[in-house]
């Protein structure tokens, strides 16, 4: 069994198992997350291996490594984006280690599900998109503010507090619902537009995957998108798998 850990911007998620889907647990940084990890992991049988992806501060990774050492006297494998992985994915970045490990693992996870050209959309603090062709070549990507960042940008100079209400309606009828409608519809529409343009340039269609905490809100009602909440963990398993023979 593996213990796989995803250190995000707002919470830590982990999976104990040998495949996806499996039960995924999480703790917010607003809680006493160190103690919760110790209490939860103390109940687990010793994992065969422990691996971690992080987009947060190095101090959090260091704390988790210390917890793992205390519990099992094991080291933690830290995922870093690579130029080539198991004959499955080739990253376009000149310095692949600069690519966020969450984006890298999400592409690997999608490639484990589909070998067609694909786009992977991350829906968290930021909206990220990465495109991969049918041969596993990473074509590049983009990053936009996520829902909460967009909301904060609109409200930061507002004198009064505006309680947000997420709405499926195209138009709002007060300030809160107008902001909600704008963000809710503009973000996925912008992503759609970029993918449509990319398809026109490349001359073929891309399968569309979405993952992250806001994936269902933003893309759940769009039938062209496949919502895969466990995509990063799927990428971890793909990375840890033995290389395929070619």
Swiss-Prot record:
Keywords: ATP-binding, Coenzyme A biosynthesis, Cytoplasm, Kinase, Nucleotide-binding, Potassium, Transferase
Binding site for ATP: 6-13, 125
Cofactor detail note: A monovalent cation. Ammonium or potassium.
Highest taxon above the source species: Bacteria
Pfam assignment, any one: Pan_kinase
Binding positions (substrate): 93, 100-103, 175
EC primary class: transferase
EC number of this enzyme: 2.7.1.33
Cofactor: NH4(+); K(+)
GO terms, biological process: coenzyme A biosynthetic process
Record field: catalytic activity: (R)-pantothenate + ATP = (R)-4'-phosphopantothenate + ADP + H(+)
Pathway the protein takes part in: Cofactor biosynthesis; coenzyme A biosynthesis; CoA from (R)-pantothenate: step 1/5
GO terms for cellular component: cytoplasm
Localization (cell): Cytoplasm
Disulfide-bond pairs as recorded: none
Subunit-structure text: Homodimer.
UniProt record similarity statement: Belongs to the type III pantothenate kinase family.
Its biological purpose: Catalyzes the phosphorylation of pantothenate (Pan), the first step in CoA biosynthesis.
Stated name of the protein: Type III pantothenate kinase
Organism listed in the record: Dichelobacter nodosus (strain VCS1703A)
């Amino acid at each position: 069994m593996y213990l796989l850990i995803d250190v995000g911007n707002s919470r830590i998620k982990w999976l104990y198992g040998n495949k996806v889907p499996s039960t995924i647990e999480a703790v917010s940084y607003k809680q006493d997350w160190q103690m919760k990890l110790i209490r939860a992991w103390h109940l687990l049988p010793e994992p065969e291996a422990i691996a971690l992806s992080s987009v947060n501060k190095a101090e959090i990774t260091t704390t988790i490594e210390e917890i793992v050492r205390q519990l099992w006297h094991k080291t933690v494998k830290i995922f870093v984006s690579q130029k080539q992985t198991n004959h499955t994915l080739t990253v376009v970045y000149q310095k692949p280690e600069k690519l966020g490990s969450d984006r890298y693992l999400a592409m690997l996870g999608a490639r484990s599900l589909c070998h067609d050209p694909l786009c992977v959309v991350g829906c968290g603090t930021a909206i990220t998109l990465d495109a991969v062709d049918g041969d596993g070549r990473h074509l590049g990507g983009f990053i936009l503010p996520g829902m909460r960042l967009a909301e904060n940008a609109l409200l930061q100079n507002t004198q009064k507090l505006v309680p947000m209400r997420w709405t499926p309606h195209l138009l709002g009828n007060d300030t809160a619902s107008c902001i909600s409608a704008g963000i809710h519809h503009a973000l996925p529409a912008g992503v759609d537009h970029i993918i449509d343009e990319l398809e026109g340039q490349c001359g073929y269609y891309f399968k569309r995957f979405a993952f992250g905490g806001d994936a269902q809100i933003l893309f759940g009602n769009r039938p062209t998108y496949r919502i895969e909440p466990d995509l990063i963990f799927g990428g971890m398993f793909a990375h840890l798998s033995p290389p395929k023979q070619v």
